[in-house]
């Protein structure tokens, strides 16, 4: 009897071990969800394990045979989040090769996913160590932390600067030197004065209504929501006042972020003094918009490549950023660990990304090294803009970030566009914002204005 029981126990133990091994075995399909090709490009270009990329870029094959399947759903009208949410809710019942393994999130809605059961603990579940993570900028971890648990990591840090046209600065201020231009734009009163000077010369200071929004919204005194009350910060209303003034005086071109007018204003025929941009915007958007021929080499002689420079501007701010999250239910934890470690913790890879693309990477040591080097951006006329980013990045404060940021930020800009256009008065714009918020977030009960 004892012998039989021992055999049974041995069999059960063996089966348990086999099940454990099977469950720990890495899947051969790595499903990654994102909203554009930015991370896909970084992954394909800089993850050392990439072996082959499909011609249509729908898949990437790794050295161990793992096939990365890319699902890219554009952000427009909340499309990305809607489809992601639907897939995550079905994650438990999905076949192993259909489960999401990695998905990307943005700062404005990071807490929605970070503070949820759909994301894994980067340390406890994935296995990254404090030693690996210590070199990242603190704010990038603060954004992706809930109840002390880190749920996402990023390869980039996104402090903001003011990118201006050198040729226009020379015409308006008599200089294009970043230090001298910064002295002329170091607070909002000075910024407004230069806007008046620029208008007298036939230029617009900004392209449109939303350009300066992040600079104001990142310098608020409290989060958007307190309990169930939306509290509109006084600094948000300063943005409203400035934008209305600029519109009435012709200091902007009445464009909206991402529309065709806004993009054209950054190009060869543009007459706009400058644009508020964070790190990704300079290399991912502004550079592309500056070219006369997008199919020709990005170099001096193609459009206004080389005619931009950057300075700190009137207030420090950050804008955007993309975080890598491991999805609960993944069978690729070890692969995800390696992806996160290589793309967000490796100094040499961080240096390569920044040197090649001008993206500002999330490695303090690497960025400080470039900041003090002879690194020069040809796009920015030979300027070492990394030095300005390195100065700004450690000071980014995420203490006022919250789960309602995306809806409130987008809602206030949408509601007040009609006010800037002269279609409604300010009281109607306020009521329209209240309607947008109450419809989007039924749990919120009131909006308080300063």
Go through each PLM region and give its residues.
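Bacterial N-terminal signal peptides
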Residues: 10-16
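Periplasmic-binding protein-like
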Residues: 42, 166, 341-370
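Long, aromatic- and glycine/proline-rich binding clefts that accommodate carbohydrate-like moieties
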Residues: 303-306, 354-418, 446-450
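Helix-loop-helix "hinge/cap" segment bordering the ligand-binding cleft or interdomain interface
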Residues: 125-134, 142-212, 224-256, 328-334, ...
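Conserved N-terminal structural module of periplasmic/extracytoplasmic solute-binding proteins
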Residues: 6, 19-111, 130, 351, ...
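Extracytoplasmic/periplasmic substrate-binding proteins
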Residues: 48, 238-338
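Hinge/lid segment of periplasmic solute-binding proteins
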Residues: 92, 103-161, 189-192, 298-312
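Short helices/loops that flank or line small-molecule/ion binding pockets
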Residues: 81-99, 103, 116, 169, ...
């Amino acid at each position: 009897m004892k012998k039989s029981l021992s055999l049974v126990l041995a069999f059960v133990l063996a089966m348990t071990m086999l099940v454990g091994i099977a469950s720990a075995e890495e899947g051969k399909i790595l499903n990654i969800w994102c909203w554009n090709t930015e991370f896909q490009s970084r992954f394909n270009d800089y993850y050392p394990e990439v072996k082959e990329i499909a011609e249509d870029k729908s898949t990437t094959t790794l050295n161990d045979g793992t096939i990365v399947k890319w699902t890219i759903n554009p952000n427009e009208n909340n499309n990305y989040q809607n489809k992601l949410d639907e897939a995550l809710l079905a994650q438990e019942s999905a076949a192993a090769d259909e489960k999401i393994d990695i998905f990307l999130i943005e700062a404005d809605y990071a807490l929605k996913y970070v503070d949820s059961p759909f994301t894994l603990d980067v340390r406890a579940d994935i296995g990254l160590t404090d030693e690996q993570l210590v070199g990242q900028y603190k704010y990038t971890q603060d954004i992706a932390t809930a109840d002390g648990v880190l749920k996402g990591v990023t390869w980039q840090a996104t402090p903001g600067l003011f990118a201006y046209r050198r040729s226009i600065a020379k015409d308006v201020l008599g200089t294009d030197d970043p230090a001298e231009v910064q002295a002329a734009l170091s607070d909002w009163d000075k910024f407004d004065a230069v806007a008046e000077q620029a208008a007298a010369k036939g230029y617009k200071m900004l392209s449109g209504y939303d350009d300066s929004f992040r600079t104001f919204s990142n310098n608020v005194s409290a989060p958007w929501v307190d309990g169930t009350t939306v509290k509109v910060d006084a600094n948000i209303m300063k943005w409203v006042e400035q934008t209305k003034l600029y519109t009435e005086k012709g200091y902007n071109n009445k464009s909206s972020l991402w529309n065709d007018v806004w993009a054209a204003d950054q190009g060869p025929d543009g007459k706009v003094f400058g644009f508020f941009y964070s790190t990704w915007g300079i290399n991912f958007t502004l550079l592309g918009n500056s070219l006369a021929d997008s199919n020709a080499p990005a170099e001096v002689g193609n459009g206004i490549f080389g005619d931009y420079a950057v300075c700190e501007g009137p207030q420090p701010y950050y804008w955007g950023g993309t975080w890598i999250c491991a999805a609960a239910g993944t069978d690729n934890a070890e692969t995800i660990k390696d992806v996160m470690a290589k793309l967000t913790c490796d100094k040499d890879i961080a240096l390569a990304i920044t040197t090649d693309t001008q993206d500002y990477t999330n490695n303090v040591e690497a960025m400080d090294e470039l900041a003090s080097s002879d690194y020069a951006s040809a796009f920015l006329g030979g300027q070492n803009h990394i030095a300005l980013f390195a100065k700004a990045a450690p000071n980014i404060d995420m203490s006022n970030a919250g789960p309602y940021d995306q809806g409130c930020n987008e809602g206030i800009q949408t509601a007040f566009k009609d006010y800037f256009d002269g279609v409604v008065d300010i009281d109607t714009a306020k009521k329209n914002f209240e309607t947008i918020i109450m419809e989007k977030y039924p749990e919120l009960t009131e909006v308080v204005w300063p």
